[in-house]
C-alpha cells in the first residue's frame, strides 16, 4: 500500500434549513475546488439568532483531502 498524506482544513457551512444541510453545503462547496475529499468531522453546531428567531444553522467542520505535491 502506498504512503499517503492528508491535509485538514476547517470550514463553516450555513443553512436556513438544518445543521445537516449546513454541513453538506460546506463539503459540497469545498468539493468545487478541492480534489479527493476524504472525511468530514463536525466540530461544532450553533445557531445565528435574531429577535428570538433562528436565522441560520451553522456547522463548523474539519475536512480532509489527499495532499498531492505539484509536479
Region locations from a protein language model:
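Basic/polar N-terminal segments that are highly enriched at the extreme N-terminus
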Residues: 1-2, 71
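Short, well-ordered alpha-helical segments
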Residues: 4-37
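Short connector loops at helix/strand junctions that flank enzyme active sites
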Residues: 6, 37-40, 54-60
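Flexible glycine-/small-residue-rich
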Residues: 13-15, 44, 61, 65-67
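Short, conserved loop-to-beta-strand elements that form functional interface hotspots
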Residues: 40-48
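C-terminal structural segments of small proteins and small subunits
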Residues: 51-71
Amino acid at each position: 500500500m502506498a504512503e499517503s498524506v492528508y491535509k485538514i482544513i476547517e470550514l463553516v457551512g450555513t443553512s436556513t434549513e438544518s445543521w445537516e444541510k449546513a454541513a453538506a453545503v460546506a463539503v459540497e462547496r469545498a468539493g468545487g475546488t478541492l480534489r479527493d475529499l476524504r472525511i468530514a468531522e463536525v466540530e461544532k453546531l450553533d445557531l445565528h439568532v435574531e429577535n428570538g428567531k433562528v436565522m441560520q444553522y451553522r456547522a463548523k467542520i474539519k475536512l480532509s483531502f489527499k495532499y498531492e505535491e505539484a509536479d
